């Protein structure tokens, strides 16, 4: 996250987690001098941060003018709060979105029977599951998008969705902003001018991801309405939310309906895309139920949560890359974040999978997802089942604490998952720490990234107590220790009150009913307090 010595170009690209390019580029940074800088430019912004070209910081755009804001904090959290006041606060995701998501994976073969076998497996193993996601092959292959269920695989989609709802599940489906030439919708979209064009008057197309791919023009109000109606039909059928994939590979030689500069639209396109989808969800589901799962973003995109890290390999290196990228994103005003638990590309070892599950279920949002193989725990080993169950139940029991922090995120812009330096700015040991994080204002989590089960982590000054074991440790020190798979360094900051729910089988329940308050290392004469939100977000305030 420390960019000193780097050249950083703000330019969205589809690059996975193991490259210098990024799906989400935000022209914003903060410094240890008490201020942040936001460059208000939709196109490419180039930053030289004490690189070989400049001694300090320089940023430039290819334009006739440059607008930027200097934001005084003085603390990093205050800078982020003011930055999101300027560019938009993150919306509050629904409670159910904080539970465990399971997917079909990307290019696997599946039908309703396959999906039922996964859901049955979770129920039989007592693993709480909140959301089931259908990736691209809910539609007929290479007709993406046609917004129609593949009848060969899903002959009764409305009935299927109703059956899943009766089992207490929410349903997500994969979409993108593309219309393939094979899609039955292509002719209509071309005829009515809903697609990006070339300067010769023809539709802009390429074969990068599927033959004859065209791109919806979200600067055209009629195209937005047309696209929205397709999504509304799915919501009426029983779909609850959408995974808004892609949005990065946007051409710089296209012609837009409203005459927009295609170079400036390259980064900004994803904002319009996700805004359209999020507005449909708010219209049909209500503001309290709107949530999507987005890969690409630009400044202001935090208003349309949730975002996930993108394509990563299934190994420890990529697991660590994912966290580092996530903390960079949340430091840029994005309040909620997720990643592909177990890794996306290839298939992880059981060891990596189990460690990633602990990390993933101690993230704001948790999704098991892969590319060519399924991510159900029993595909790895029986111990993996125990690990997923344990941490899924732990997260459910932490919902009173997590949801309080989620509400604060929506009010202030301060992220749920935050880098150590955001909370402990004066502690120089935290400046470069990107392998551990604060989950909310009281919990410190340090995932394990080694196959020898060794955890290496740092506790800042103060008294820290393990949430899992009750062990008390002195801060201002580094620790090295071995952990089993049902363990992770998870410590509570001194002076904290953590509200623990009475249930561990679901993310949605009355958090105030039967709640337990755990007080940690309270000092004499100091008053601590916490808040619990009940069924309709009413407050219950406790002072100790």
Report each predicted region and the residues it spans.
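Active-site pocket-lining segments that scaffold enzyme catalytic pockets across diverse folds
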Residues: 111-113, 117, 132-135
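Catalytic core of carbohydrate-active enzymes
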Residues: 278-290, 297-308, 321, 325, ...
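Aromatic- and carboxylate-enriched substrate-binding clefts and catalytic-loop regions
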Residues: 128-388, 423-425, 433
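Conserved small/polar residues in nucleotide/adenosyl-binding loops
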Residues: 542-544
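Catalytic and substrate-binding clefts that recognize carbohydrates or anionic sugar/phosphate headgroups
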Residues: 1-95, 103-106, 112-113, 119-124, ...
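A residue-level signal for conserved active-site and pocket-lining positions in enzyme catalytic cores
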Residues: 28, 83, 122, 164, ...
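Short acidic-glycine loop/turn motifs at beta-strand connectors
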Residues: 30-34, 41, 199-200, 460-461, ...
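Residue-level detector of short, conserved catalytic/binding motifs and their immediate flanks
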Residues: 24-28, 33-35, 66, 98, ...
């Amino acid at each position: 996250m420390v960019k000193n010595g780097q050249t950083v170009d703000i330019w969205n690209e589809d690059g996975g987690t193991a490259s210098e390019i990024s799906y989400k580029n935000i022209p914003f940074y903060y410094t240890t001098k008490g201020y942040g800088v936001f460059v208000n430019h939709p196109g490419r912004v180039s930053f030289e941060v004490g690189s070989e070209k400049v001694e300090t910081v320089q940023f430039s755009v290819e334009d006739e003018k440059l607008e930027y804001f200097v934001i005084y904090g003085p603390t990093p959290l205050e800078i982020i709060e003011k930055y999101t006041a300027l560019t938009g606060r993150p919306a509050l995701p629904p409670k159910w979105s904080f539970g465990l998501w399971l997917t079909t994976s990307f290019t696997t073969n599946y039908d309703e029977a396959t999906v039922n076998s996964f859901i049955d497996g979770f129920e039989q193993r007592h693993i709480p599951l909140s959301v089931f996601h259908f990736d691209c092959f809910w539609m007929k292959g290479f007709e993406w998008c046609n917004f129609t269920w593949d009848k060969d695989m899903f002959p009764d989609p409305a009935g299927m969705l109703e059956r899943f709802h009766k089992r207490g599940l929410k349903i997500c489906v994969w979409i993108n902003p593309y219309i393939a030439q094979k899609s039955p919708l292509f002719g209509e979209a071309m005829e009515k001018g809903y697609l990006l064009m070339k300067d010769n008057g023809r539709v802009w197309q390429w074969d990068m991801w599927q033959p004859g791919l065209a791109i919806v023009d979200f600067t055209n109000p009629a195209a937005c309405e047309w696209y929205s109606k397709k999504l509304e039909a799915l919501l009426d059928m029983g779909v609850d939310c959408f995974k808004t994939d892609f949005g990065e590979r946007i051409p710089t030689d296209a012609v837009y309906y409203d005459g927009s500069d295609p170079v400036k639209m390259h980064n900004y396109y994803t904002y319009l895309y996700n805004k359209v989808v999020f507005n449909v969800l708010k219209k049909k589901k209500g503001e309290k139920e709107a949530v999507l799962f987005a890969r690409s973003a630009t400044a202001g995109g935090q208003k349309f949560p949730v975002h996930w890290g993108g394509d990563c390999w299934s190994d420890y290196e990529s697991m660590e890359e994912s966290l580092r990228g996530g903390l960079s994103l949340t430091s840029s005003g994005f309040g909620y974040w997720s990643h592909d638990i177990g890794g996306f590309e290839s298939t992880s070892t059981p060891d990596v999978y189990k460690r990633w599950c602990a990390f993933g279920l101690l993230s704001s949002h948790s999704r098991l997802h892969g590319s060519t193989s399924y991510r159900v725990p029993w595909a790895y080993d029986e111990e993996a089942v125990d690990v997923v169950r344990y941490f899924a139940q732990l997260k459910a029991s932490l919902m009173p604490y997590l949801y309080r922090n989620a509400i604060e995120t929506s009010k202030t812009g301060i992220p749920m998952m935050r880098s150590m330096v955001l909370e402990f700015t004066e502690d120089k040991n935290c400046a470069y720490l990107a392998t551990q994080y604060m989950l909310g204002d009281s919990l410190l989590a340090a995932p394990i990234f080694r196959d020898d089960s060794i955890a290496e982590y740092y506790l800042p000054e103060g008294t820290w107590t393990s949430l899992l074991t009750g062990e008390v440790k002195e801060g201002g020190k580094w620790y090295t220790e071995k952990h089993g798979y049902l363990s992770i360094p998870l410590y509570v900051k001194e002076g904290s009150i953590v509200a623990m729910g009475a249930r561990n089988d679901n993310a949605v329940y009355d958090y105030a009913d039967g709640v337990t308050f755990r007080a940690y290392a309270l000092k004499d004469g100091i008053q601590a307090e916490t808040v619990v939100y009940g069924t309709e977000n009413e407050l219950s305030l406790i002072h100790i």
